[in-house]
């Protein structure tokens, strides 16, 4: 299918429904198979995502109930590196990131791949960044959208969600926005070119930590209502807001995994 169509489906799958607040909850498998539906990914894409779904099933069995997102990224990217020997690293990384994002955000792959209803379902785990589940969810959602749609759309979706949170949710959070933008950068680096895709795999293989892919969020304002946000930053085109974005981008640019 067209990359733009896939990007839209990924955005709908990951962003349309409020994310779970505790450990990832995987719904029980239906007892009666659903009526056949058209798979929206190609057979090759479906097979790749299935491989990483199975990888998650096995990996989480060895993880504690609450653990850093890195503990799942490492085995998935190791699998991607192995599979890339017979294919394109960009395709393998994209499928790995998509399967990861769907799992971490507690969604169902059936939105994208109806036949996945019969696939093994991984046990639930609470994946975190800086000990926060919401940052892991933001990071992986933006990584998947960035890997399929590119930075502008991923950044726009992340900003739209924060503005909506300011109006009626948990409040505008620059920490969440930092996770969004770091995730977008990760997704782009993993899928932009073959050299960058393989380089990322190699960096993760040689030793990996949260501090290499996710910036510190200390000092980034959070939980701002729409009124609070407007009083402090006036709007998303103000110098005050731009300075905050510049600070976030500075922190991301300094992360080791994104260095050339």
Enumerate the language-model features and the residues they cover.
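TRNA-recognition modules of translation machinery and tRNA-sensing kinases, especially anticodon-binding
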Residues: 162
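Intrinsically disordered, low-complexity, mixed-charge
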Residues: 2-156, 166-177, 181-260
């Amino acid at each position: 299918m067209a990359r733009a169509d896939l990007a839209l489906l990924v955005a709908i799958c990951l962003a349309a429904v409020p994310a779970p607040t505790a450990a990832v909850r995987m719904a029980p498998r239906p007892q009666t198979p659903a009526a056949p539906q058209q798979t929206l990914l190609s057979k090759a894409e479906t097979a790749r995502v299935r491989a990483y779904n199975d990888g998650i099933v096995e990996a989480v069995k060895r993880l504690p109930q609450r653990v850093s997102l890195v503990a799942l990224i490492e085995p998935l990217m190791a699998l991607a590196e192995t599979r890339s020997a017979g294919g394109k690293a960009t395709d393998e990384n994209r499928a790995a990131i998509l399967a990861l994002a769907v799992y971490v955000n507690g969604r169902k792959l059936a939105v994208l791949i109806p036949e996945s209803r019969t696939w093994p379902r991984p046990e639930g785990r609470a994946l975190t960044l800086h000990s926060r589940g919401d940052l892991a969810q933001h990071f992986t959602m933006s990584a998947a959208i960035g890997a399929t749609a590119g930075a502008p759309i991923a950044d726009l979706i992340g900003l739209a969600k924060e503005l909506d949170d300011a109006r009626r949710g948990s409040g505008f959070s620059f920490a969440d926005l930092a996770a969004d933008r770091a995730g977008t950068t990760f997704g782009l680096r993993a899928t932009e070119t073959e050299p960058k895709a393989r380089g990322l795999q190699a960096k993760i293989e040689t030793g990996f930590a949260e501090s290499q892919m996710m910036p510190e969020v200390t000092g980034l304002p959070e939980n701002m209502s729409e009124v609070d946000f407007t009083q402090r930053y006036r709007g998303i085109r103000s110098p005050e807001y731009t300075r905050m974005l510049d600070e976030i981008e500075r922190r991301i640019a300094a992360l080791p995994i994104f260095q050339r």
